[in-house]
Amino acid sequence: MGDSIPPSDTAESVTAGHPDKLCDAISDSILDACLLIDPNARVAVETMVKGTEGQAVIVLAGEVSLNGHPPNYEEVARHTASSIGYTDSRIGMDATSQEYCQVHTHITTQSQFISQGVDGDLETQGAGDQGVMFGYACSETEGTPELRGRFFPLSAALAQRITRRLEI
């Protein structure tokens, strides 16, 4: 074996206008709309967007369980995207236009198999199919005075720092 390449970490941090930000905003708005109907609603909705000059698509998929009539998911998605500024097909999406922006909704009620694991009292309640995400503290940022005290992976701290400067 010859010389080996040392391992490297990468990280991503996106700015306003990135499709991930729009997708998160739409999914958050759907959650908010469901919680207005039923404060105990269970919502697992993912959003995907793809826009090109002249045509765009918003795809909503997932599972929702709530007591009451569900919100109009397409209306929530269009309103959220247009309130952010996606109102011109020349910039990739006109969410106000039925002609230039399609919304595909694939949202069903929660599977009975998952539901039975999360129904019941808090002592025996499971997590269903939702994952648990976690981070970790480390000393990588301690060697950089401006980042000291964050106890964060250096690659992630630098990615966020660059993003903040781009948004100024």
Predicted feature locations:
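N-terminal, positively charged regions that mediate nucleic acid binding
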Residues: 1-44
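Glycine-rich, mobile lid/loop segments that gate access to catalytic sites or pores
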Residues: 10-14, 49-55, 82-168
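N-terminal low-complexity, intrinsically disordered segments
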Residues: 18-21, 72-76, 113-115
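Short, non-transmembrane amphipathic alpha-helical segments
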Residues: 26-29, 34, 77-88
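Short, charge-patterned binding micro-sites
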Residues: 45-67
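Short, conserved charged micro-motifs
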Residues: 67-75, 151
